[in-house]
Amino acid sequence: MAAGQDRAMPHPVLIIAHRGASGERPEHTMLSYQRAIDQGADYIEPDLVPTKDGVLVARHENNIADTTDVATHPEFAARKATKTIDGETMTGWFTEDFTLAELKTLRAKERLPQLRPGNAAFDGQADIPTFDEIIALAKRASAANGRMIGIYPETKHPSYFASIGLPTDARLVAALKAAGWDRADAPVFIQSFEVDNLKRLKAMTSVRLIQLMAATGAPADHAASSYAAMATPAGLRAVAAYAYGIGPDKAMILPAIPGAKPTALIADAHAAGLKVHPWTFRAENIFLSPDYRVPGTPATHGRIEDEIRAFIGYGVDGFFTDYPYKGASARASALAAAAERGKD
């Protein structure tokens, strides 16, 4: 197989369902992942954190106060705690203080009910899924749909979890090996905002690795001076020594100012041999690049498909979206337009 070829996927631009179809269902639930699959996502994205007994589960962060009904469970009131994680102090309930059996008694709820009231209608209908359950869903859905549906796990706060005796890298690799998905051509990407854990993972697995980059700040493990430095041509060449691609904030490609022009990041990454999967394409005005907003409220859906088409035109290799069906529509029209131009 040629280097960089994705044998498992039929499309040149991948649709990655960000926390599932999180624009229409509460994030990181089986409801959200199934919705994403039904809408044509190529990959579903579980963020992974460990339980007290070392099981990987899908939550965007280990503080579950905002995404579950834990606050309504009097039996867990005493678990409320204040912790400092990656330099940020927060109060809530944390996955590492619950066994899997205890977490399974909780129910998920919508993170952004003011922006997405329709999602809140599904509050209480889903539990917190394990990584193994998500892998099983992807495999079942692949067989049922006759197309490969991959997974795109992110290791959340790996340095923090290692510091409290719950390292996640080996658990993640073990789950992939058990699934038979520990290969370079498996329908899997592993992503992280940190650097050293990706380097460790490179020694542990041949699965493709993605270095995430934020528009500001630096990796929590202090392995690089800043994400901005990592996004320079020299920084990207260093990333290419251990990663298959990068997952930058979309504002690193198109600055979040009116009339912005795209940066050189995609071209520089491609020159270093890296794929580019930016995040996150969301339909609501508040999240759109300024030129793609429409009159209305922050919750009003703007021109997300135009925004995605623009980024496909810039040369991205995939993209994260909360709305996979809009991503699928945008990709189809962009590829059709490109094919039409190719006839000229």
Q: Which residues does each PLM region occupy?
A:
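Phosphate-group recognition and catalysis centered on beta-loop-alpha active-site segments
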Residues: 1-344
